[in-house]
Amino acid sequence: MSEQANSSGIESLSNGLRERNAQASKPIGDGEVTSQSLEDKLQVEEGDAADAEKKTFGRTPDGKVFTVPPTRDMVSQLLSPSEPKNISDIFVLAILGCHILLLWCLPSSFRIAAFAVIFLFWRASYNIGIGWLLHMQSNGRTLVCWAKKSNIFVNPSTGQNPHPTLYKMLKWELETKISEQYSFDEAPTEYNTWLVFRRVVDLILMCDFTSYCLFAIACGGRPAGESFIMLALRWTTGMSLVLFNLWVKLDAHRVVKDFAWYWGDFFYLIDQELTFDGVFEMAPHPMYSVGYAGYYGISLMAASYKVLFISILAHAAQFAFLVLVENPHIEKTYNVPPPRKRVAVDTDTKLQEDENSHEGSVVSDIANSAPVMPALQPVSMHNLLGLHNIDLYRSTDQSVLLAQLLFFALTTVTPSTPVYQFCFVLNAALWRIWYSVGIGYILNRQSNCKMWTRHFVKYGESNHEAWRQWKGTYHLSMTMTYASFIAAAWKMYSFPQDWGYGLVLLRHILGASLIALQIWTSTSIYESLGEFGWFFGDFFFDQSPKLTYSGIYRFLNNPERVLGLAGVWGAVLITSTKSLVFLALLSHTLTLAFIQLVERPHMQKLYGQSLRRDAGLVRSLKRSLPPSLKQIHGSVDKILDESFEFIEEFIEAARPKLATGVQTFVKDTSALFQKYPARVTISRLEPDLAGYDLKDYSITLEGTQPSQPTQFERASDKEGERARSMQFRRGEQENLIFEYGAPIKVKWTAPLNHSKKDWIGLYMVTDNTSREVTSVASQGRWIATNQASFDSETCEQGLISSDIVLKITREDCEPIDVASGEMVFSGDKLWWTQGVFEFRYHHNGKHNVMAVSRPFEIRIGRFDEDIVEADNYGLVRAAVEAALLPVVQNCFDRDPEIAPQTAEEHYGCLVERDGKYSKRVVFAVQHMFGIEFAPEVVRADGNVRNLAWRICNAKKVLAPYSMSRSNGASTPTTEHED
């Protein structure tokens, strides 16, 4: 079920909470609102003020506003005797009864396997079945399309509903359940579809939980030799987890109501502000994280590893459901980029470059025309963290990889004798001391007197160079610290001889879980802070103090204080050695000291009173504590503060000696040193093709032609003498060449009786060897010829008109009437590469080809440097901007919200969120200018002007290695060398 609560304006995405308000629920469709507006609806209801306050108003994607009737929760509907029961309730209860009866009837030897299969079936129905339905509904409104196509919610008296019995049953079912403020005939199709979807969800969720409990009962037992104290402790802990799980579910339902519980925003949105409190202040995704604590409580009470393993599997499947289904929908629905601010630019003064000839270095050529970048915070284009950011051309990555290989080699080739174990533990301890004390000292000095930055400024470097070197130092220190700890843990670990002995298996499971928790915590911290915050950027760059709490920081002030070291204690559980306990205690103590002595003073100095005292989890716990425990909490805080104050005073007194030693050490040390997706071949022959004349089918194309020089790029000096000149062609013989990324209009004709499920797809010419049957999937690059013909609205995007009667004359001079239509392929329905393509008209939803368009070519023309004076930098850059702007607009789908209208206008926010746009641009730049950029460069530059400057700069730097003709000086000859 959907576990997202609703926020009133605080970071809706980073913590998984859906921010639902009036602004977020605007119509998604492009058409105008055909129903009465929300204001009109409110005016109708304002006669009864007390009543109106209790009402919730929903809004469908096409803008229709309706009153959302109150509904009851699933358990009350099914199990409460006071609630009216209908056929679906009786059916669900009967299925649950069959599960319980099956447990009683099956023999004990077969019971565990049977209920394991039953539970996995219902769990797959939940995560895969419901997940697929919600995914299709989110992307193509498939469930609503099914309902509209079948007309099951249309009154049979209109003659449009072919299922009157089903209509009567659904009407009785839903109106029995919702007796207040609900009319089956007046409710929107989206709402009725959601109600039917709810009944399916009720069945799956109830059977999922029931089968899990029955599986636990089948596996339950008492371990041999277990003492009464362990039995009581096991059941007490298990029941506590189950009760906590129950509270999480109830509190979550109190906050999100049935609307979010049953994924209502996949169907419609509500117009109201909703609160953010309770369990949603305690943990991110509480329904999917702490909301599964009961599974582990039941596993503990059952004392069965089988129940524990199947609980872990179910929990992992639930997280996959969250990542693959819910999060993309949340991003699309509630995290819509804000409208871009338009900036009026004076076209007469937008280019004010120095037009003097460039006789000096590259830096002097471009100094006056460099783009204005924000100086407060460095733009991150080449990140360090993550496997996908590894760059073997970068010295930091080379050092890190070589060090890891060295550690791996030493760990594997050396024996695990006490001497080597001591050396590895000592090495891990020294690295941890350096990582906390050494790095902490550098950051403390940087915070107080900019020591690190001053060192680089002394040698003429900039603060950005100091920042770059600091990131490398910190990254290397961090990786070495954890590599040394892992090596020490490996040396101290001994493979268990008997996994069933004692708590060996449980220790490994808990240890692996703690390691996974630390990995997730570190990932969440990085997603919240970014590269700048991860490397303590506010110690190096003074920016306006604006502190925001997003992601994991909404729940914890310092997640690294506990959760950030969970993996260290996980290694302790797995190895069960005193040496690892020592390393874990040392790591935890030094981390707490680092936070208290380095981070906290700097944060107080930088942000002052804007620092938050208590995080969401602490606030929730304090509200639930009795007054006596609150007083104890205050006393503990006072003791800790006094202890850290004593440590600070001690370090302050010893600082001169420490500084002298560190400076000497630094001086002495510095003196020494990317798919191819699987193609599904589908060949479905239609038996009734004999009734159609292929001459009545046709496809014609209209698109944006590229510039004239691009048309003649085929001709070069590589051919024979007779082939160097291009033939003059026109009309049907003219080569069709369209711009990269430009929309293509397709006009089609078909017989008047053509199938309403016909469709047109875009393919590479070389993809299909047959002209009669298409053998490869279109991968989403297709549009239906008629509306409401398929169970998705995605295939209708780009459809302009259909079934317009047109009189044409055949080749045999016979005039006939045909159906015609138009559609536009753009954005994701295009191929974002160069090549030769064709459109294919297909019959009746199958892959039988009725018509094929003329082949056309998508080509990116190379920038002609000969058209401008290479010595005039201003003219070159202006020409690059002029050539680049339309290409960037095409790459951004010509969307006015993200595509710039001028070279100075910044890109829309969606470019930073969706990497496909920047990847399109770098592909085009590489083919236009012969320069390969990373996608991060496009996002960092922010507009065409800055990107053009970067291209010109790169062309100058790479001029000696250019493979194209240049007006500049050539390589020096022997005569010049002499």
Curated annotation (Swiss-Prot):
What is the similarity comment for this entry? Belongs to the class VI-like SAM-binding methyltransferase superfamily. CHO2 family.
Provide the reaction this enzyme catalyses.
a 1,2-diacyl-sn-glycero-3-phosphoethanolamine + S-adenosyl-L-methionine = a 1,2-diacyl-sn-glycero-3-phospho-N-methylethanolamine + S-adenosyl-L-homocysteine + H(+)
Has the keyword Kinase been applied to this entry? Answer: no
Gene that encodes the chain: CHO2
Sorted alphabetically, the keyword list is: Endoplasmic reticulum, Lipid biosynthesis, Lipid metabolism, Membrane, Methyltransferase, Phospholipid biosynthesis, Phospholipid metabolism, S-adenosyl-L-methionine, Transferase, Transmembrane, Transmembrane helix
Q: What class of enzyme is it?
A: transferase
Enumerate composition-biased segments (Basic and acidic residues): 714-724
Spell out the protein name for this chain. Answer: Phosphatidylethanolamine N-methyltransferase
Stretches in topological domain Lumenal = 1-89, 135-199, 249-281, 326-399, 443-473, 520-564
**Entries under InterPro entries matching the protein:** Phopholipid_MeTrfase (IPR007318), Phosphatid-EA_MeTrfase_fun (IPR016219)
